[in-house]
């Protein structure tokens, strides 16, 4: 876990000083009220974006207080990973009086900016969000929010405040060690082609770097876009093995497509793991229902959610 102390929250005065106009004018611009010239409006909005200032939607005497909400920002609800994380967060917050409120970004940096802006305007008691890679605007908002910020799932980078997760580079590297140690050399990779899925990218980088240290390169790779599914795993496995039938191992970027690949290979009579080895990533419960075990890496999703919630709730420093 990496930590860094947050700064004090920004105020209208900060935006006023940065833009060179009065606090009253700043307030009118940010609330979209009153007659303000286009040039002044742009000057104020630019200063607010640069500083990371988010207007406070809580009125009157409550304006200096925080609400009993924890903003949870995740990239997706369509896979099996983040519901487990949310379960851990919810379970840990259950006796604290804090309630998680979820925003989904669909792996879009601009969408993450918008979700964070809206959530921070209600002055939550903390923020939990996935990953360490964010836009400059998002980092500015979080860095100046003056509340606990926990970035989850990844520790390969510098956190804004606190990071809780695993090293994906190490996960990829250690899987390569296991595969090479078992004697496999003709290795194929099947994974997502999403530039904003930074954790999958880091795992693959760690995997390939360790292979290279042993003089081995990926013999084939197959990428897909969009969500993961068993059917997609079947299709991609058929495609890569039709093109490169002498592969002796397939490394999948997640368990869902890995499970689909395993089922396809079993239906066609592959000797697993003798003729062909397979591995995925995440350690999801789905694997327990398969007729054969798929090698995987446990990403500790529930534990990550629980620890992030403990930090936001002040149970753990």
Across the structure, where does each feature detected by a protein language model lie?
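Flexible loop/hinge segments that line or gate small-molecule binding clefts
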Residues: 107, 130-174, 256, 282-294
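Short acidic capping loops at alpha-helix termini that bridge into adjacent secondary structure
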Residues: 186, 218-221, 272-277
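Flexible loop/turn connectors
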Residues: 243-317
